[in-house]
From Swiss-Prot:
Record protein name field: Bifunctional pantoate ligase/cytidylate kinase
Biochemical pathway: Cofactor biosynthesis; (R)-pantothenate biosynthesis; (R)-pantothenate from (R)-pantoate and beta-alanine: step 1/1
UniProt-annotated stretches for the region Cytidylate kinase: 254-490
Source organism of this protein record: Synechococcus sp. (strain WH7803)
Gene, per the UniProt record: panC/cmk
Keyword Chaperone: no
Length: 490
């Protein structure tokens, strides 16, 4: 837009850091007429070109682009192409109060992306509804750009940084400062369980009015769908819009009742362990390798000479069995059974060949599911397996079904076996083994391999490991803002 402030400075600096000196950061300042209604502040919206140039340069921007209206809309705003944001994403929060606003946003951003063709699009989390709509835009149109978010920057009195803050006089500023503090206090009360959500919203409205603010809306919505939040969701968005005099202000907080849980399911050989381990390290999550736990039980059954297909024989070996997973260290997680390190042993082809048989026994699944759910009580983890999103953590915040074609998985399996020093069958034999294991996993009676209804399918054929991890991070950030789960530094 324009009227750059410290929130924009943080956004620019973060984008510069993400480039690592290998790219350029272009800052666009265009006051888009399509985003303003008839009685809104288009004519008086801050246009501070000299100050914007100085701020962008100091923050590390490579260039500042300040197009005029004809450059962006060569046929005029009434004759050119216009997009319409989906009604489901604009039915709540700012949508009903700013008719056509988000249509103007998606139209100008699509135009910007077409002209610039960036690799990344950096936006502030302050306007979460706008950020979410643009993430949907990029996903739905299959655009080759990553949408990245930057946490809300707050000024000294707690007010979210905004170009419109300069409209406020000293007295109004004092009144407006009650906005963010009231939101934060309400979120704390809801998280603590001292008040139910509906009552909290009523009380918040009253508190804002008593502070001298005119309330437009106070709503709690799902961060991804922007629809009223389903009871029991661990992460919800509490958002509000008020007017302080003639100045319209928006703000939000997240209500998070436990740390995030990510469930990654998929067939054997899809690369789940490799990418989930790296994703956990990137996002600061505990890595729960449930597949390794089933492999550990399989190894235990084989080492005791029991028949993996016999449920009574397997169940007899489970009493007192302890499977331990250590935290990741330099990308490696140690697996122990009753204190013995079997990290390498569980990757033996003999274990691989029997793990589906052992995992199909209800007694094994009951034991390990209970252990896994106990680890997940506080959240803050990512788990991968076959039934994480359907059986182990059905309330996971993010669910992904990671897969690849049997041909691709056979090639990956061959490389893994070769790297570990094992004999490598021909690709046709490996592919046949993979297809058979898929059949066993998907047809077993207890917790079969199926994609959860609310999971996102990610097909990884042709993708590098880094690209898959980026895709997982983007799915995570769709729901989990940096302001509530910052990306670890270093």
């Amino acid at each position: 837009m324009g009227g750059l402030h410290q929130g924009h400075a943080r956004l620019i600096a973060t984008a510069v850091t993400s480039c690592g000196g290998k790219g350029s950061v272009l800052v666009s300042t265009f006051v888009n007429p399509l985003q303003f209604g008839v009685d809104e502040d288009f004519d008086c919206y801050p246009r501070t070109f000299e100050d914007d140039c100085a701020l962008a340069e100091q923050a590390g921007a490579s260039a500042l682009w300040c197009p005029d209206e004809r450059q962006v809309y060569p046929y005029g705003t009434s004759e050119g192409w216009r997009l319409q944001a989906p009604a489901r994403l604009t039915a709540h929060l700012c949508g009903p109060w700013r008719s056509g606003h988000f249509d103007g946003v998606v139209t100008v951003v699509m135009r910007l992306l077409g002209l610039v063709r960036p690799h990344q699009l950096w936006l502030g989390e302050k306007d979460w509804q706008q950020l979410t709509i643009l993430r949907h835009l990029v996903n739905d149109f299959g655009l080759r750009v990553r949408v990245r978010g930057c946490p809300t920057v707050r000024e000294g009195d707690g007010l979210a940084a905004s170009s419109r803050n300069r409209y406020l006089g000293d007295a109004q500023r004092t009144v407006a400062s009650a906005f963010s503090s009231a939101l934060c206090a309400t979120a704390r009360d809801v998280c603590a369980g001292s008040v139910d959500e509906a009552s909290a919203q009523v009380a918040l409205r009253q508190q804002l009015r008593e502070a001298g603010l005119e309330v437009e809306y106070v709503e709690t919505v799902d961060p991804v769908t922007l629809q009223p939040a389903r009871p029991g969701r661990s992460i919800r968005l509490l958002a509000a819009a008020v007017r302080c005099g003639e100045t319209r202000l928006i703000d939000h907080v997240f209500i998070m009742t436990r740390s995030p849980i990510v469930a990654i399911d998929g067939p054997a050989g899809a690369g789940k362990s490799t990418v989930t381990r790296a994703f956990a390290e990137r996002m600061g999550l505990l890595y729960l390798d449930t597949g390794a736990m089933y492999r550990a039980v399989t190894w235990w059954v084989q080492s005791n000479g029991a028949d993996p297909s016999s449920a009574p024989a397997v169940e007899a070996l489970l009493e007192g069995l302890e499977v331990d997973l250590s935290p990741l260290k330099d990308g490696v997680q140690t697996v122990r059974v009753n204190g013995r390190d079997i990290t390498d042993a569980i990757r033996d082809p003999e274990v691989t060949g029997s793990v589906s048989l052992v995992a199909a026994h209800p007694c094994v699944r009951a034991l390990l599911t209970k252990q896994q759910q106990r680890l997940g009580e506080r959240g803050g983890l990512v788990a991968e397996g076959r039934d994480i999103g359907t059986a182990v953590f059905p309330d996971a915040d993010v669910k992904v079904f990671l897969t690849a074609t049997p041909e691709e998985r056979a090639r990956r399996r061959a490389k893994d076996l070769e790297a570990r020093g094992h004999a490598v069958p021909d690709l046709a034999a490996l592919e046949a083994q993979i297809v058979e294991r898929d059949r066993l996993d998907s047809t077993r009676e207890v917790a079969p391999l199926v994609q959860a209804d609310d999971a996102t399918e990610l097909i990884t054929d042709g993708m590098s490991i880094e690209a898959v991890i980026d895709a997982l991070e983007d799915l995570f950030r769709f729901r989990v803002a940096k302001e509530i789960w910052p990306t670890p530094q270093g």
